[in-house]
Curated annotation (Swiss-Prot):
Protein purpose: Site-specific tyrosine recombinase, which acts by catalyzing the cutting and rejoining of the recombining DNA molecules. The XerC-XerD complex is essential to convert dimers of the bacterial chromosome into monomers to permit their segregation at cell division. It also contributes to the segregational stability of plasmids.
First-listed, main subcellular location of the protein, grouped into a coarse class: cytoplasm
Assembly behavior: Forms a cyclic heterotetrameric complex composed of two molecules of XerC and two molecules of XerD.
Pfam family, one: Phage_integrase
Domain Tyr recombinase: 118-309
Organism in which the protein naturally occurs: Mycobacterium leprae (strain TN)
Gene responsible for this protein: xerD
Entry protein name: Tyrosine recombinase XerD
Top-level taxon of the source organism: Bacteria
Any one biological process term the GO annotation gives: DNA transposition
Residues covered by the Core-binding (CB) domain: 4-97
GO (cellular component) term, any one: cytoplasm
InterPro entries tied to this protein: CB, DNA_brk_join_enz, Integrase-like_cat_sf, Integrase_catalytic, Integrase_recombinase_N, Integrase_SAM-like_N, Recomb_XerD, Tyrosine_recombinase_XerC/XerD
Keywords assigned by UniProt, alphabetized: Cell cycle, Cell division, Chromosome partition, Cytoplasm, DNA integration, DNA recombination, DNA-binding
Length: 316
């Protein structure tokens, strides 16, 4: 059990992130989860205060994250997830130094694990088309949920948006005449991205024939400006949007474990395969660095290599 002192110090840092840093709710949730795990790690080692933490305690926390605890049902974290947890821990210790709670930043020298370079998985163009067509949305007899689902999936693929960006859209963020969408990215950064005609048509159909029906099911005085609504008239959650995608993949016969991020990967990969400049793809994806976008060029190079290996007489 986490001690009262550790709980107070942890909550003080979280309050600082909310009030002073105004970090996004999703980021705050991740920090809280990682820091609760860290405080439990310290408590299990008999440490009741951040002033008693040493560099080796932080290093051992990383080891514990990577190893997991099968006996307690705690899964091992990937190098990427463990590195993310270390960011939260480092922030906590920097805060403790700044607030005079401790004298030294014992987490500063701890290095994150090096993640392996994994190529992002993407769908083929035919698989994406099958996915989109599996939800309907083209008949006037389609209900509001079908219209919503088609519009959501079309928008995800057309814009390459993150699932949180899509469900966070308000009606005023979409201009179907100009065929643009204003996305709220990580760190509150906005970007205006173009939307393809099929996605605009799906959005128009949903906004005209579907959304108003769903909105009437919600409390009138608390009507949400969200574009994508759930069956009760409230904003669609990330989890529900994920389920929409999984159901569509199942109906399309795609068994490769489709996720919202896979649709985003497909967006980037298909653009690069079509000859798009990597800097343009970076802007569309909302990546802070082009290095993040370059991983998708490896996917297209890998596809070219496979074709070459099967066709060139001197490949083998």
């Amino acid at each position: 059990m986490t001690t009262a002192a550790l709980q107070t110090q942890l909550q003080g840092y979280l309050d600082y992130l909310i009030i002073e840093r105004s970090i996004a709710a999703n980021t705050l949730s991740s920090y809280r989860r990682d820091l609760i795990r860290y405080s439990k790690h310290l408590s299990d080692r008999g440490i009741e205060d951040l002033a008693k933490v040493g560099e080796h305690d932080v290093s051992e926390f990383l080891v514990a994250l990577r190893r997991g605890d099968p006996d307690s049902g705690v899964a091992a974290l990937s190098a990427v997830s463990a590195a993310r947890a270390l960011i939260a821990v480092r922030g906590l210790h920097r805060f403790a130094v700044a607030e005079g709670l401790v004298d030294l930043d014992v987490a500063r020298a701890v290095r994150p694990p090096t993640p392996g370079r994994r190529l992002p998985k993407s769908l083929t163009v035919d698989e994406v088309l099958a996915l989109l067509e599996s939800v309907g949305g083209e008949s006037r007899a389609d209900g509001p949920l079908v219209l919503r689902n088609r519009a959501l999936l079309e928008l995800l693929y057309s814009t390459g948006s993150r699932i949180s960006e899509a469900v966070g859209l308000d009606v005023d963020d979409v201009d179907t005449q100009a065929r643009t969408v204003l996305l709220q990215g990580k760190g509150g950064k906005q970007r205006l991205v173009p939307v393809g005609r099929p996605a605009v048509q799906a959005l128009d159909a949903y906004l005209v024939r579907g959304r108003s029906d769903l909105a009437r099911r919600g409390p009138g005085m608390l009507a949400t400006p969200a574009i994508f609504l759930n069956a009760r008239g409230g904003r669609l959650s990330r989890q529900s949007a994920w389920q929409v995608l999984q159901d569509a993949a199942e109906h399309a016969g795609i068994t490769s474990g489709v996720s919202p991020h896979m649709l985003r990967h497909s967006f980037a990969t298909h653009l690069l395969e079509g000859g798009a400049d990597i800097r343009v793809v970076q802007e569309l994806m909302g990546h802070a660095s082009v290095t993040t976008t370059q991983i998708y060029t490896l996917v297209t190079v890998q596809a070219l290599r496979e074709v070459w290996a099967g066709a060139h007489p001197r490949a083998k």
